[in-house]
From Swiss-Prot:
Entry's Gene Ontology cellular component terms: cytosol
Pathway: Glycan biosynthesis; glycogen biosynthesis
Protein name: 1,4-alpha-glucan branching enzyme GlgB
The keyword Ubl conjugation appears for this protein: no
Listed InterPro entries: A-amylase/branching_C, Branching_enzy, GlgB, GlgB_N, GlgB_N_E_set_prok, Glyco_hydro_13_cat_dom, Glyco_hydro_13_N, Glyco_hydro_b
Quaternary structure (record): Monomer.
PANTHER family, A to Z: 1,4-ALPHA-GLUCAN-BRANCHING ENZYME
Amino acid sequence: MTTAVTQAIIDGFFDASNGDPFATLGMHETEQGIEIRTLLPDANRMVVIERESGKEITELDCVDERGFFVGVIPNCRQFFAYQLQVFWGNEAQIIEDPYRFHPMIDDLEQWLLSEGSMLRPYEVLGAHFMECDGVSGVNFRLWAPNARRVSIVGDFNYWDGRRHPMRFHSKSGVWELFLPKASLGQLYKFELIDCHGNLRLKADPFAFSSQLRPDTASQVSALPNVVEMTEARKKANQGNQPISIYEVHLGSWRRNLENNFWLDYDQIADELIPYVKEMGFTHIEFLPLSEFPFDGSWGYQPLGLYSPTSRFGSPEAFSRLVKRAHEAGINVILDWVPGHFPSDTHGLVAFDGTALYEHEDPREGYHQDWNTLIYNYGRNEVKNFLSSNALYWLERFGVDGIRVDAVASMIYRDYSRVEGEWIPNQYGGRENLEAIEFLKHTNWKIHSEMAGAISIAEESTSFAGVTHPSENGGLGFNFKWNMGWMNDTLAYMKLDPIYRQYHHNKMTFGMVYQYSENFVLPLSHDEVVHGKYSLLGKMPGDTWQKFANLRAYYGYMWGYPGKKLLFMGNEFAQGREWNHEESLDWFLLDENIDGGWHKGVLKLVKDLNQIYQKNRPLFELDNSPEGFDWLVVDDAANSVFAFERRSSNGERIIVVSNFTPVPRHDYRIGVNIVGEYEEILNTDSMYYQGSNVGNFGCVASENIESHGRENSISVSIPPLATVYLRLKAK
């Protein structure tokens, strides 16, 4: 038998402090019969109706004029499905009582959630439109184990926290309520009384859709359908395939010309996909698209990890964008940020009054570089929340890979901290063992559940084994950004050519560690912001030399082992730094403006991508010493480099770069194979606005010793240029 309803209990509902509503509301067995209790602020009358027959059963007594009703059905001993006819003055409506429905989360689900071993917690937590006992509605669930009370508030109840307090499951710390007649598209939040008695209004961490900033509510949205991985997409991700990535910030790639506002996902698909296809890129990498409050973070401070940002449209529209990329044969990579989150009050910070998602000690839980909070990777539920989010984007939107941001800040406890600002691990070391285990677990989950999907690490240190299998002690990533190569080569390219001879090793040192990891060569957004200048702006010399330097550098990069990544705008040598609030300077491609300098770089990048995809020596053996051989590595005086790229079937391409403005005629290079070498690329071609110094299409080897080899070729190396020479098939 149930306990009687006291005035204190009723008062607890109206001051929104009652944390156990199902102990009081709904149907309860008493000595007199079944008693029905309902809470509906401001209602005048309440009548119980049998749902199946529509028959009026009884009118409930109003025991508190604020809107609390109680009534007994004499001699009734069996619970039944009912509805409530509610009178508001002279108006009446029939509603379903959310407190007549049984719990929908089972013991196994609760155990898996608390253990952090549920593969797809987003199928259980959050807001799910569904049908229960023939009634459509939304089932809301929230993990907040230390809250005293949680209510669901939204469009459906005037954002009144008194109306729909939720059921607490102590085994898992999950609050639950099925809300009949709630529907897709409605806005909602969770209203909590935290462990300290403070009122908090929180967005849903598992929301599939969110409001556009500055509004912060979650939106009921359907769980996206599973997108199956295809064999073609799997193949395009493999390490022995050409991977050329176009990195894109959706808010500034191209904007509406009339009002400088964003294009939506569908408009972006109309313009971006054909452009990327035409340019020959194999992959698009989007800067983070999980919902985020501050435009200036570029998405790198997300709060709605399961919500595609509403800046550009709905989750369904984002799905269409990915689908159209796939239809064009382009794979999609998404930047993913599990390293930290902002402290906006509607977000994860102090979620239930405790440091639920973050660490309580700021030496572990506060990131001073970005004024953000660091996830507690040692907590099962948090680890599962994050790792499953990666799977969600891959499985539910068809994203082909993730690029994990700021890995170094995750795996080192002393990252950007001085002594006294960090806590050693249990062994006294600086490694964040929990974060390392989290990354291994996430990569295991990705590769076991979405075979063919890839993960890429932005890891800026020499941490060993980033791309090694986790079973061999590695982190389990497929690729790692080669930050060392990028920093060294850009430092070299910034130098006046007369000084480059003294820094020759900056262009060659990368081969010392080339085979330690599977690398991507990144010329990313980070290199064209915050006073670093554009890539073109980094190049020394007058206009001709700046463009020639950049073209030569691109040629060197596309010939060098490693997958390629280029941030938008760099494909046509935008002259100013990237600005996230403006479109790229597409007008620079008008040849009437500057004589075609920028158009020349655009043509070069397009040709580089096409040559890259069509020639196996340039991509097949990136991670094998069999695929590379230095031919000229020590000619610092002339700033000349030459190396051979090879494929498994014996195809060979020689890459020759001259990083001085002096043409090198009759320059002899030792070769491994006798034959004719055809010039398939020359960054100094007049087609790219170069000076057109070259080799008239082909050079033949001669039996003249050079660079320790019996045979050699004599070539003309253009000024500030890179040339590709392909061995002709016999």
